[in-house]
Amino acid sequence: RKRAAKPGMHLDKPPVTAYALQGGADKLENVMIIGNNLHVDAFYDEATSTISYLVMDRETRQCALIDSVLDYDPKAGRTCTASADRLIERVTELNASVRWVLETHVHADHLSAAAYLKEKLGGHTAIGAHITQVQKVFGALFNAEPGFARDGSQFDVLLEDEEGFRIGNLHARAMHTPGHTPACMSFMIEDAGEIAVFVGDTLFMPDYGTARCDFPGADARTLYRSIRRLLAFPDQTRLFMCHDYLPGGRDMQYFTTVAEQRASNIHIHQGIDEDSFVAMREARDKTLDMPVLILPSVQVNMRSGQLPAPEENGVSYLKIPLNKL
């Protein structure tokens, strides 16, 4: 694939427009227009505190879906597509066509609906090229079936750092921002000089801090450098979160700005040096339990949202490696 030219960044544009959709308790979408044609819908999954996005070029109606959720009941071992179906309904409402089904990384706290969305809506599944590292580590941990490829081929496109792509007429760029996992990517999208970055699990809202760094292949020092790269964008750049944990019981928030993160992020505001951050992050990570859904999530997500291959009885099974995490 040819790489798109890196878009220019202009700062003399009016502020973003944002408004909340009206609806019942299950209508948690938020809508934002950035620049002239960058439309962002945010969908909050209360069960996993995950925020999924529909990002659309209003001119061409072409869109990308970012970090979707496949609902999973660990007690019953059952999946459900209710969260993903909300995305499908919104795509239909907007009369949009799906170009991309993007994953910022192999999530450890929710299952991805990428395979289901591609089946229903089309589009190309994409993730960072370092997915192969994650597949090798977790393919071994779960003793994956011989047919499980560790080359990222479950995804349609493996994005390299600084690789450009388009969503309709919108310029987008992949940024390798490892630390939480070795394969984490952020997605920068620009329109009319306004910049939006979908940061995955690097930063959280300023009152919650940063992502953990105790998974295989994770590294706190690497995360610090990735975050500083994100915070090098202009002050007014919008940063879109992948999770919000509602500290103190506040309302859900799904975006912040570079300026707000620099000024008040409790873990990595301006003035916190690399060694201090690493010491804090490593000490904090020692106190954290594993995510409730890490074992099912990783097995599904390293396969681009597909369940493990069915066994001879036609049933897919998830494994529990004992005493390994």
Describe each PLM feature range:
Residues 19, 26-39, 130, 225-238, ...:
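Accessory terminal helices/loops
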Residues 68-70, 106, 130-131, 180-181, ...:
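Active-site metal-binding loops of divalent metal-dependent hydrolases
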Residues 40-43, 54, 162-192, 232:
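Core dinuclear metal-dependent hydrolase active-site scaffold
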Residues 101-111, 175-184, 240-246:
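Histidine-centered catalytic micro-motifs
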Residues 63, 70-171, 194-195, 264:
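Active-site HxH/HxHxD metal-binding segment of metal-dependent hydrolases
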Residues 208-234:
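Active-site-adjacent loop/tail segments of enzyme domains
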Residues 33-97, 187-200:
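Conserved beta-strand hairpin/beta-sheet module of binuclear metal-dependent hydrolase folds
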Residues 1-30:
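N-terminal amphipathic/basic-hydrophobic helices that include classical n-h-c signal peptides
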